[in-house]
């Protein structure tokens, strides 16, 4: 759910 690139491991 977060903007792309917020986390390299998980994007929710």
Curated annotation (Swiss-Prot):
Q: List cellular component terms (GO).
A: extracellular region
Residues carrying 4-hydroxyproline: 4
Q: Which domain of life is it from?
A: Eukaryota
* Protein name stated in the entry: Vespakinin-M
The transmembrane segments are none
Under the GO molecular function aspect, what terms does this record hold? toxin activity
Entry similarity comment:
Belongs to the bradykinin-related peptide family.
Species this protein is from: Vespa mandarinia
User: Biological process (GO) annotations?
Assistant: regulation of blood pressure; vasodilation
Location in or out of the cell: Secreted
Function in brief: Bradykinins are a potent but short-lived agent of arteriolar dilation and increased capillary permeability. May target bradykinin receptors (BDKRB). May cause hypotension.
The organs and tissues expressing this protein are described as: Expressed by the venom gland.
Keywords attached to this entry: Bradykinin receptor impairing toxin, G-protein coupled receptor impairing toxin, Hydroxylation, Hypotensive agent, Secreted, Toxin, Vasoactive, Vasodilator
State if Acetylation is listed as a keyword: no
């Amino acid at each position: 759910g977060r903007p792309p690139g917020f986390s390299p491991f998980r994007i929710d």
